[in-house]
Swiss-Prot record:
Entry protein name: Small ribosomal subunit protein uS15
HAMAP family in the cross-refs: Ribosomal_uS15_B (MF_01343_B)
Keywords from the UniProt entry: Ribonucleoprotein, Ribosomal protein, RNA-binding, rRNA-binding
Function: One of the primary rRNA binding proteins, it binds directly to 16S rRNA where it helps nucleate assembly of the platform of the 30S subunit by binding and bridging several RNA helices of the 16S rRNA. Forms an intersubunit bridge (bridge B4) with the 23S rRNA of the 50S subunit in the ribosome.
Protein family according to the UniProt entry: Belongs to the universal ribosomal protein uS15 family.
GO process annotations (BP): translation
UniProt cross-references to Pfam families, sorted A to Z: Ribosomal_S15
GO cellular component labels: cytosolic small ribosomal subunit
A GO term for molecular function: rRNA binding
InterPro entries cross-referenced by the UniProt entry: Ribosomal_uS15, Ribosomal_uS15_bac-type, uS15_NS1_RNA-bd_sf
Gene that this sequence comes from: rpsO
Transmembrane segments: none
Lineage: Bacteria, Pseudomonadati, Pseudomonadota, Alphaproteobacteria, Rickettsiales
Length: 93
């Protein structure tokens, strides 16, 4: 359910804004999206894991807040590019 260190370093290198950037909103959003995908796969198998389902809802809210921040700070074009790159729906249009 968590992201492996190898996968996390791949995500960091793919979404970083500059070398050594591990905490930007783009990287955080990518890592949250990976965690959400992992939890979704877990919940397909374990349908009655309600504790995990609540954790999924918390992660979705955190990602939505990060996406709102990216849209507000960096503009709509970079936001839409990130949404397309992550393969998620645009919730604000």
């Amino acid at each position: 359910m968590s992201v492996t260190p190898e996968r996390k370093s791949e995500l960091i290198s793919e979404y970083c804004l500059k070398k050594g950037d591990t905490g930007s909103s783009f990287v955080q959003c990518a890592i949250l999206s990976e965690r959400i995908r992992n939890l979704t796969e877990h919940l397909k198998i374990h349908k009655k894991d309600f504790h995990c389902r609540r954790g999924l809802m918390v992660l979705v809210c955190r990602r939505r807040n990060e996406l709102q921040y990216i849209r507000r700070k960096y503009g709509n074009d970079r936001y839409l590019a990130l949404v397309k790159q992550l393969g998620i729906r645009d919730v604000f249009h």
